[in-house]
Amino acid sequence: MSKKTGTKKKQTKHKEKQQGFNDLLIPMLLILCIMPFIVRLALYSCGYAKYPWYSDEDVIMDLYSYYRCYFFEVVAIFTAAVLAFRSGLFPENRKKMKIFIPLAVYAGMILLSTLLSVNMGASFTGNFYQFQGVLVLLGYLVFCLYAYQVMEQEKDYKTIWYGIVAVFIVMAVLGIFQIAKKDLLDFAWMQRLVMSKEQFAEYGGTLETIFSGNNVFLSLYNPNYAGVFLTMFAPVFAVMCSSEKEKKKKIFYGILCAGCLILIWFTYSRSTFFALLVALVVGSILSKEKIGKLMKYILPGILILAVVFVGIDKINDFHYLSRWKEDTPKTKLERMITSKDGVELCYDGKEYLITLEDKKAKIYDKKGRETDIKKVEYSAKMAIAEYDEEKYIDVYLCNQTFTFGKNSKGYYYRTENGKETQLTDIPKVDAGGKEYLGSGRIYIWSRTLPILKKYIVAGSGPDTFAEVFPQNDYVGKAIYANNPARVIEKPHNDYLMQWVQNGFLALVAMIAFYVLLLKKCGTFYYKRELSDIKTRLGLGCYLGCICYMAGSLFNDSTLYTTPVFWIFAGIALASAYEVEK
C-alpha cells in the first residue's frame, strides 16, 4: 500500500468519525460541564506559618479548589497528549497557528517565573484557595489551542451548545436554592457527599458559606466568580435567541438569557454590569442591523429590565442597589509605626508618641508634652490600656485592638496571632483617601503598584501574590479591609496579578493575544449573517470573552471561570477560521 493511499484511508476514517459524535470534544465537555460541580472537602497546609502575618496553624479547609485543580491538570495533560497525537496523525487538518505565537511567549514567561519563584512548591502545585500553579496556567492555553483545532463540523458546535445549556440549567437550580437562602450545602445529606465519613463526624453540620443572605455563588465559592461565569454565558444565550428563527426555540433561549440575567443580579456583583455593557456595545457595532434600528429594541429592553430588577431589589430590601453606595471608613488614623522610642501615631493631622514607662502607658504630643488621652478629642473611639503583668499596651482604633510590647530593641506590634513584628511605613500610591472604593480594591491596587517594578522580566511565580503583597500593612488592612490579620491573596485585577506573578513581559504577551483575538474575530463577525450554529455560537463565545476581559479589570483569574474563557476563545477563533477557509 502506498503512503498516499494510506493517508487517504486515514482521512476517510477521520471524516466518517466526524459525522457522528466527535469524541475529541470529551475533554472540553469535562471541563465545561463536570468540573464546575466538583466540590470536596480537603485539608492542606498553605505553608504560611513561617510569616509573621499568619498564624502558626496553617492548615486550611477547602471545598472548591483543591480537587478541582487536580481534575483539571489530569484532563489538561490528557488533552495535550491527544492534541499532539492528532496533529501528528492528521497534519493536513492542523489549522494555522500564527495567532497563538503570543501565547507561546506567555507560556515561556510562566515557566521562567516558576523556576525563579519565591515559592517554587506553590508555583508548581498551586496554593491558598487559588490553586493555579504552572500546570493549570499552561492547561488553560492547551484548551484554547485544542478547541481551536478540534472544532470542525456543525455537530461539534451543537454538542458544545447542548453542554452549555445543560450546565447552566443545573447551575440555575443551585442559584434558585441560594436565592431562597437554602444552599444545598446546608443539608446534611449533601455534606455527606462532599466529605469522608471521618470528616463528616468532625465537621458535619458546621460548614458555613462566607456569604450571608441570598447571594448567588452557585458551586463557584464566591458571588464575584459566579458573576464572571454567568456573564460569559449571557451573550451566548442572547446571540442564540436573537438569531433563532424557530419560535419555540427562540422562547426557550430567551428564557435561558433572562434566567442568566436574574442570577447575575443576585450575585450582587457590580463589575458584571460593566462587563455586560461592554459586550452590548461591541455586539451592537458588529450587528448587521443599523445602530439606530437596534436602539429601538435595546433601549426599551434595558428600561424594562431596569424596572424589573429594581422591583426585585425593592422586595429584597435594596440589597443590590445599596452596594453602589460605598461607606467611607469613619476614622482619621493616618499613620502608625513602631520605633525604638515608642509607637508613633498620626491622627487627624496631629502626631503623638505612645510609650510604656514603668508599666504605665503614656502619650505625648509632637512637642514632647505629656497628654491625657481623655483630653485628646478624637472623632472615633480611642483608648489605651496596659497589662499589669505583661509589658503590653492596647490601643483601640478603627474598631480594632492594636497590641504593642517593649523589649531591649524598642517597641513592637503583637499580631492577633501572637507574633511579634514591626509596624513600618508601607510603599503606596496616594489614592487621596479613596482606598475604600470598589470594596477596598483601590486599597489593594495602591499597595500593589509600587511592587510592579520588581517583576519586569520574571514574576514572583504562580500562586505567590499573597507572599509578595505587603501583608505587614496592618494599619491599612484595619482601615480598608476591616481586619489587620486579613490575608490579601489576590489583587482583584487579573492584569495586575499577571504582572506580579508572571512578569510584565508575560502580561504584554497575554494582552497581545487578546488584541489579536479581538481583531481577528471582530473583523470576521462584523455584519456577518448568523445562518448556522457555528457562526452563532462563535459570536456568542466571542462576546463572552469580551465580558471576561472587561471584567478582569475588577476580578482575578480563577479555576472557576478562566477555563471557560480559554475554551470560548478557542471556539470563537475556530468558528472564524472554519468559514474563512
Segments (PLM) and residue ranges:
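Alpha-helical transmembrane segments of multi-pass inner-membrane proteins
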Residues: S2-K9, K15-E16, G20-L41, Y70-R86, ...
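Interfacial/capping segments of alpha-helical transmembrane domains
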Residues: L43-S55, L184-S196, G459, F469
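Non-cytosolic membrane-interface motifs at loop->transmembrane helix junctions
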Residues: S123-V134
